[in-house]
Amino acid sequence: MNVVFHRRFEKMAGKLPAMTKKKMVERIALFSKDPLNSVLRNHALHTPYKSSYSIDITGEYRAVYELIDDQTALFTHIGTHSHLYK
């Protein structure tokens, strides 16, 4: 799976704690090799992220993405569960 990042995602990722950034890199690398790996807990979202999906970065942090086509995912948001889904 090809991965691209929205500018907003890059800005949000830049504000993450160092250990979370490291975990993010690991999880997105895993996602690019195996998007349905059970560790990622990949799942579809509802309002306000209709037609988007989420993967777990840590127990607290999630990354939200949209599928552009069969082989490309656009990551749009990253943050804590409570911040993203309030």
What positions do the PLM features span?
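A short, surface-exposed loop/turn module that caps and links secondary-structure elements
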Residues: 30-55
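Enriched for short, Lys/Arg-rich terminal
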Residues: 2-7, 11, 15, 22, ...
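N-terminal non-globular leader segments, chiefly Sec-dependent signal peptides
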Residues: 15, 23, 29-33
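Hydrophobic alpha-helical segments, especially transmembrane helices
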Residues: 22-24, 28, 42, 63
